[in-house]
């Protein structure tokens, strides 16, 4: 599963090497992280914490690397994705699909946040992110 996500992520990053952290936690730890990092005292399914792209969108970072051998540059540090396994399992049952499919959905959702997509910035941004999420999930199903 992780390998397939790596293939998708490299495709989205135009084969530039990247690194990201993935933390799988329970609802209790997710609630603590959400409270500390976002001021929300509740659990959630997935959180993303970007590193390099807080001030520079991904496209700007990639443009600066254009023309260079991607293997000669250090990997792009995307950030961290935190997934609550407890919530993942509950949502898989509620939605009616496999734990694997829900894991893919949450990982892709978190990854897109690391790339600068944000469904919380309005309806148009939400629509764009949903389209990209569906596109990525379709690619994963084909791998």
Curated annotation (Swiss-Prot):
Assigned keywords, A-Z: Cytoplasm, Endonuclease, Hydrolase, Metal-binding, Nuclease, Ribosome biogenesis, rRNA processing, Zinc
A Pfam family the protein falls into: YbeY
Cofactor note: Binds 1 zinc ion.
GO annotation (BP), single: rRNA processing
Broad enzyme group: hydrolase
Assigned EC number: 3.1.-.-
Localization, UniProt: Cytoplasm
Gene Ontology cellular component list: cytoplasm
InterPro entries associated with the record: MetalPrtase_cat_dom_sf_prd, YbeY, YbeY_CS
Binding site for Zn(2+): 109, 113, 119
Primary location class: cytoplasm
Reported cofactor(s): Zn(2+)
Example GO molecular function: zinc ion binding
Physiological role: Single strand-specific metallo-endoribonuclease involved in late-stage 70S ribosome quality control and in maturation of the 3' terminus of the 16S rRNA.
NCBIfam families: rRNA maturation RNase YbeY
PANTHER family, alphabetized: ENDORIBONUCLEASE YBEY, CHLOROPLASTIC
Stated family: Belongs to the endoribonuclease YbeY family.
Protein name according to UniProt: Endoribonuclease YbeY
Organism: Leptospira borgpetersenii serovar Hardjo-bovis (strain JB197)
Protein encoded by which gene: ybeY
